[in-house]
Amino acid sequence: MMQDLRLILIIVGAIAIIALLVHGFWTSRKERSSMFRDRPLKRMKSKRDDDSYDEDVEDDEGVGEVRVHRVNHAPANAQEHEAARPSPQHQYQPPYASAQPRQPVQQPPEAQVPPQHAPRPTQPVQQPVQQPAYQPQPEQPLQQPVSPQVASAPQPVHSAPQPAQQAFQPAEPVAAPQPEPVAEPAPVMDKPKRKEAVIIMNVAAHHGSELNGELLLNSIQQAGFIFGDMNIYHRHLSPDGSGPALFSLANMVKPGTFDPEMKDFTTPGVTIFMQVPSYGDELQNFKLMLQSAQHIADEVGGVVLDDQRRMMTPQKLREYQDIIREVKDANA
């Protein structure tokens, strides 16, 4: 189908070009004839005025007839326009005198004038002639648009992955909201640091003496302490050793451990300590610890000292109690 359409278009184009050529040639001839008629009339008027010139024309009638025959041959050689340009000016003069009685005979010489204006129509004639010569060439440009169509097809293929890339871009900000700003565990770390305390008191022998191991063991057991973890004694919630440990008792001498067999054991003193917060009521546990320390000191003949190993005073006891309350309130 495409080939048939091409042939039809070529034929129609050729016919149109030929029609244009014929029409142009016909119109050019028509214009030339009109111009030719106007010019001889003007010249004839001038010739009538000149009597001397008329006599010369009558003498040259025979020559004019010969030149008329040449004019008849001129249309056959219409292509040689440039060579005939100088001659037509002299050829027209004699025929005009004879042309007065023979006006119809002057029509063939009209072809002599076209050489002057002939190059103008010949130029458009050559242009359309070149066009049919290139008419078979349009088949090549028909193949060229076929290739861009194929090239245009992959373009949307490349444009398709572009939105896909845009779809991946929003995926990146999705990973941006990281849970890093969640720094809430920091206050959790503050609680143990700010509100942990250890209440310490000592039971020591008088200056220059030591506590007897056997007496110390009996007083410790009477106060409700039981030997246990870390090789030290612990005071539990229940006197039989059950329940959580409320406070503990260690040797004042490093490493602070005891040997259950304390018959031959002596020491300058022992240390009783309680960690706050602790199980139950810390103030009640503190009172129980103070009572145990006083009981042991009375049994072994020692004294109760504070954490600086100074004599225990009522002010120091109130200070211990204030510390316990602060920790208790902070952990409430």
Swiss-Prot record:
- Write out the biased-composition intervals (Acidic residues): 51-63
Where does the record place the region Disordered? 42-190
Cellular localisation: Cell inner membrane
Which parts of the sequence lie on the Cytoplasmic side of the lipid bilayer? 28-332
Membrane topology category: Single-pass type I membrane protein
The record places the following residue ranges in the Periplasmic compartment, namely: 1-6
Q: Where is the composition biased (Low complexity)?
A: 99-115, 123-150, 160-175
Which residue spans traverse the membrane? 7-27
The family database entries (Pfam families) matched by this protein are listed as: ZipA_C (PF04354)
Which Gene Ontology terms describe the biological processes this protein takes part in? division septum assembly; FtsZ-dependent cytokinesis
Q: Which SMART domains match?
A: ZipA_C
Q: Which domain of life is it from?
A: Bacteria
GO cellular component labels: cell division site; plasma membrane
Tell me yes or no: is Membrane among this UniProt entry's keywords. Answer: yes
Q: Chief subcellular site?
A: membrane
Keyword terms: Cell cycle, Cell division, Cell inner membrane, Cell membrane, Membrane, Transmembrane, Transmembrane helix
Q: Belongs to which family?
A: Belongs to the ZipA family.
UniProt-listed NCBIfam families:
septum_zipA
Main function: Essential cell division protein that stabilizes the FtsZ protofilaments by cross-linking them and that serves as a cytoplasmic membrane anchor for the Z ring. Also required for the recruitment to the septal ring of downstream cell division proteins.
Task: Show the HAMAP family listed in the entry.
Answer: ZipA (MF_00509)
Q: How does it assemble?
A: Interacts with FtsZ via their C-terminal domains.
Q: What is this protein called?
A: Cell division protein ZipA
